[in-house]
Amino acid sequence: MVDVFEQVEEELRSERYKRLARTWLPVLGVVLVVALIGALGWWGWDSYQSGRAGKAAEAYDRGMEALRDSKPVDAKAAFQEAAETGNAAYKSMALQQQAGLAVSDNRIPDAVRLFDEAAKASRDPILSDPPAFKAALLLMDTAALDEIERRLEPLTSDKRPLHAFAQEALALARLQHGKTKEAREAFVLLQLGQDVPDPLRQRAQIAVDAIDSGTAAALPAIVNAAKAAPQAPAETPAAAPAQQ
């Protein structure tokens, strides 16, 4: 009798397992398929991004070599390829190099546009702030003060990589537009700043002296010195970020 009960119980368990299998095996199969598709998709995307970065690096190197060989047409084509195929880092750097070529050809509006595109290519201030700063400098002599302030003020935060240079440029712009008091205050702060580069500190001292002595006509020389300060990245980074 006990054997009969055990046999019946075993059959019931077997039937229960069969029902569970019919219910959950299809669901489990779908989950496994989705997971597999996701893994393959990630692998494919990672391979695609790595391939793009490699092509962009090669194109960027060709552009730099063409610049060294004084072949601006070839350089422009190579940098264009790097900007189109590269990740955020290479796109930003390649656009900055194109902007530099435009400046050399005195195509200032094109240079400003390219610097703006380079600044928008990455959210990393290390990559975005230099082109944004250069675009503002190119507009110093032609744009309204409101436009210069709109471009430079975000770069003046203490946490931004070019904050001291942006503060100097903003002070120069205000001095150019007759806001002498505001400009002098900014230059004094630059003189006293702890992390201000020595050349910039010296220019701030010159500006304060010029304002105090009424010889602010020396301003163009100060502006030209400021424009020569930070340059766009030129060399290929050891490990450019995959995406920004």
What residues fall within each predicted segment?
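Transmembrane signal-anchor/signal-peptide helices with a preference for the extracytoplasmic
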Residues: 38-60
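Flexible helix-coil transition and linker loops at the boundaries of alpha-helical arrays
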Residues: 44-48, 83-86, 120-122, 156
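Short extracytoplasmic
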Residues: 55-96
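Soluble extracytoplasmic domains of inner/organellar membrane proteins
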Residues: 89, 99-229, 242-244
